């Protein structure tokens, strides 16, 4: 079993890790591409999915001049839909707080959306730091977001773990030289997690409590 005794801080990806947004996100993509008059290839989406939307747009053949419009449409359509927490997420986060872990979020999602969902789920007091797309010049898997969180919290990588559901999350944590936890989700690339060798691989977020 991995030694987690030095870990005092847990940073979480948001989509697919804390909130069950895979289906909602896909619907938002479908509606956005339809509004732009661009065919949406589900097979290509599954193969190319990444927290970096622009790599998805590129793989799906969306012209670069439409990327910003696609972003705006996605946020609009996503906002029309309801997002629920991952099963057991709220209870797990509450228990980690009770165990005195410092918690934060590092997400590729837009700040307005992630903060809104944190508020809706009554998690505002649970997270000391929230880093979103707007605060990261370099996107996942570049470690900038994690480095910014460490700096804001005044802690080191040696006492920090990053929890995420995508290969990019694991690579991001590895490039930041911190302990990584992969958690399965319904996102298309989640099955690739094992190939990226996270320090801990779990099937559900609740399993974190076996390690921390």
Language-model regions, residue ranges each:
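Active-site neighborhood of HAD-like aspartate-dependent phosphohydrolases
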Residues: 2-46
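Conserved Lys-Pro-Asp/Glu-containing loop-to-beta segment of HAD-superfamily phosphomonoesterases
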Residues: 9, 139-170
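A metal-dependent, Asp-based hydrolase signature
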Residues: 35-36, 47-78, 87-95
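Conserved H-loop
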Residues: 39, 63, 124-128, 156, ...
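A short, structured active-site edge motif that brings together acidic residues
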Residues: 44-45, 49, 123-139
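Short, acidic loop-to-helix structural element flanking the phosphoryl-transfer center
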Residues: 79-105, 111-115, 143
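Structural recognition of alpha->loop->beta junctions
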Residues: 122-132, 192-212
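Acidic, Mg2+-coordinating phosphoryl-transfer loop and its flanking beta/alpha structural elements
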Residues: 161-200
